[in-house]
Amino acid sequence: MSSQAIYRIYGLRVRSDLPLPVASISDDGEVDLIVRRGGAVPRPVAPQPPGMALDWQEVDQGWLLRYHTRTDEVLEFAYNRDASQLEIRSTTPEMTDDITALLVGAGLATALHLRGVPVLHASAIVVDGEAILVAGAAGAGKSTLTAALVAKGAPLLAEDLAVLTFGENGITVQAGYPRLRLCPDATLIAGRAAPDLPRVFSGFVPDDKRWVEATTLPGGFRTTPAPLGGIYLLAPRRPERETPAIEPLPPHRAGLALLDHLYGTRWLRIPKVKALEWCARIAGRTPVRVVHAPPGLERVKETAEAIVADVRSFSQEVTEGTES
């Protein structure tokens, strides 16, 4: 039997026989989720998909999240009804690095969804003790900008999933894992050369991204939750943009904009009423901004500086308003 360890990630205490990219913690007997590696599954006889296919369905024992690649590899995350147990099955069980990369993303996000926890597809860094989220459409530069912020000295809190907890005194963002996944050219933002860095995926996913350890960067990694202080949504880049610009959104527009950044809204089939409720609560208690960034990798640090300055400007306004 494989050895198991206990980890705290996204606010969950996870017992897993698959090593997770966070430090293990002491076992006091309390566990929210048990992760086990199951047996190998046969390759499907169905036609190969043109790319990575994702299937989410209810099954007799609970729920099944299934990946099917164009090379006919399969990865399954099987959840019981209350998402307290997760079994992982694959045609390539030896690809533990690939499986782990998907587990700490979609695998755990799905478990949180089944538990009714809101998750934004966003990174989180910490500025002056508050969690600042960065979200954007695919290719908008979210991870690259996050790397620039951590390289500038802001601790990383979560790389791709902003797991939220609603409380009486505000919203809290849970800590994820201390890694960034970056495209090869973007690793230079973190002062690293791509050939020297491990690949996120070794073959299961056709992806050339690399892991960068946040603990090797000036900002490092924050292991504890932080109160949500602001959300920055990246607008599509325009070639004519010369300097960063940051636009505040009123709560009603912010709530609608956040709908596009709830994790797995479409394939997890989150009820629209629930999605609207979550986004309205977030927007009603949190400043939401749109970031118009100039194009070019060489301008990313400039955008990072503009965001930090905006966060501190807003925090100062709140402090002055409270004192008056």
What spans do the regions from the language model cover?
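Long, basic/Gly/Ser/Thr-rich N-terminal segments
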Residues: 1-95, 307-312
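Glycine-rich, often acidic-flanked micro-motifs
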Residues: 2-19, 23-24, 127-137, 151-314
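Extreme N-terminal, non-catalytic leader segments
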Residues: 67-131
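Short glycine-rich, low-complexity/disordered patches
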Residues: 116-121, 290-293, 324
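Conserved lysine of the Walker
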Residues: 142
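Post-Walker A alpha-helix
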Residues: 145-146
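Short, low-complexity, charge-dense intrinsically disordered segments
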Residues: 316-324
